[in-house]
Curated annotation (Swiss-Prot):
Family: Belongs to the bacterial ribosomal protein bS21 family.
Cysteine pairs bridged by disulfides in the record: none
Keywords annotated in UniProt: Ribonucleoprotein, Ribosomal protein
Name of this protein: Small ribosomal subunit protein bS21
Name of the coding gene: rpsU
Length: 61
């Protein structure tokens, strides 16, 4: 979890920017979106396979 201590003479915008950078660096939001709802293993495999096919098709262009 990202933790930000607001420094002396630091604006709230700067502190918020540091917090957002920390959250994105930790991958907190990605983890939240991944666990937002349960995905059955079979569906997860299918999505992963489709993403790989799409990637390969895009790479072949």
């Amino acid at each position: 979890m990202a933790k930000v201590i607001v420094r002396k003479n630091e604006s709230l915008d700067d502190a918020l920017r540091r917090f957002k950078r920390g959250v994105s660096k930790d991958g907190t939001l990605q983890e939240y979106r991944k666990r937002e709802y349960y995905v059955k293993p079979s569906v997860a495999r299918k999505l992963k396979s489709e993403a790989a096919q799409k990637r390969n098709k895009k790479k072949g262009r």
